[in-house]
Amino acid sequence: MLKLKICGIKDEKNAKDLAFLNIDFFGFIFAKSPRRVSLEQARNLSAIFHEKDKKVVGVFVDENLEQILRCIKEAKLDGIQIYRTITKEEFEILKVQNVFVWQVISVENSLDLKSEIFANLVLFDAKGILKGGNGISFDWTLLGSYTKDFILAGGIGLDNVHKAVQTGAKILDLNSKLEDEKGLKDINKIKQILKELKK
């Protein structure tokens, strides 16, 4: 069963509207980004989504384990999505916290899977100027050689959501293509995506 994540949530009113939609995961960005949230914001947003039985994911880039653990505890995160490599030792510590770990692999022209990955799932995103939220896709045919479950991110919107589904991804991670001019998630665009996925 395909699941959906919407990333880059930062506004509480927007979150209250989003919480009613049939979306499984919501992401809060703790790394440098226009969508970055403070711990206090994340804590408030978590409460909104948990009230509707949604899962919340913290997005990290270079943060150390101590910082990540603090965010997990204070913002009551269900999982983390991380752009740096997680070591076996860190993964074991995170498992004790009862959070899932998604390791991001930034893709340009090939899948860079040389090193061992310690995570519950791999998330493939397009390599861009920012670590995520660039609104660009990579060549999804590269995923044909990957045989394990994965998450797909990067430039997914109404124009290519069916193509994204055809990659076989277990979770689609959507962000910038669902925003209005104020950087808020556009509820109507999300409803259109949900309607399209029922076809």
Swiss-Prot record:
SUPFAM superfamilies, alphabetized: Ribulose-phoshate binding barrel
Gene Ontology biological-process entries: L-tryptophan biosynthetic process
UniProt keyword list: Amino-acid biosynthesis, Aromatic amino acid biosynthesis, Isomerase, Tryptophan biosynthesis
Enzyme Commission designation: 5.3.1.24
GO molecular function terms attached to this record: phosphoribosylanthranilate isomerase activity
Top-rank EC class of the record's enzyme: isomerase
Enzymatic reactions: N-(5-phospho-beta-D-ribosyl)anthranilate = 1-(2-carboxyphenylamino)-1-deoxy-D-ribulose 5-phosphate
Keyword match Amino-acid biosynthesis: yes
Pathway(s) where this gene product acts: Amino-acid biosynthesis; L-tryptophan biosynthesis; L-tryptophan from chorismate: step 3/5
Family, per entry: Belongs to the TrpF family.
HAMAP family in the record: PRAI (MF_00135)
Protein name per Swiss-Prot or TrEMBL: N-(5'-phosphoribosyl)anthranilate isomerase
Species annotation: Campylobacter jejuni subsp. jejuni serotype O:6 (strain 81116 / NCTC 11828)
Lineage, top ranks: Bacteria, Pseudomonadati, Campylobacterota, Epsilonproteobacteria, Campylobacterales
Gene that produces this protein: trpF
